Amino acid sequence: MKNKYIEQFEQKQIEGKNVPEFRAGDTLRLAIRIKEGDKTRIQNFEGICIARRGNGVDETFIVRKIGANNVGVERIFPIYSESLESITVLRRGRVRRARLFYLRDRRGKAARIKELKK
């Protein structure tokens, strides 16, 4: 059980953020605030969410994309991170697993995920 002061602090951290509902298998576009020296810029990172873990302030998710030269790039983001400017859900994926780590071994068409019918 957490201390009530810690719970209040964590609740304040969560209140200001507007996070869309997404799951593993969804294709996301993240706008990440990057600080280089005294300048800041926004960089987009688009990929498939392959896992979510934790809850509350400690919740994180992993996004995987295929970069240049067919190299897989995975990044782990805290959901309530200050560096995340926005999270946009581009596609809803139809998957039967909560963790899609098997996509690491797949290449090309085998790594595709079916789109969820509405």
From Swiss-Prot:
One of its GO terms (molecular function) is structural constituent of ribosome. Pfam families: Ribosomal_L19. One of its GO terms (biological process) is translation. One of its GO terms (cellular component) is cytosolic large ribosomal subunit. The gene is rplS. Keywords: Ribonucleoprotein, Ribosomal protein. It comes from the Bacteria. Belongs to the bacterial ribosomal protein bL19 family. The keyword Ribosomal protein applies. This protein is located at the 30S-50S ribosomal subunit interface and may play a role in the structure and function of the aminoacyl-tRNA binding site. This is Large ribosomal subunit protein bL19. The keyword Repressor does not apply. Gene3D superfamilies: 2.30.30.790. InterPro entries: Ribosomal_bL19, Ribosomal_bL19_CS, Ribosomal_bL19_sf, Translation_prot_SH3-like_sf.
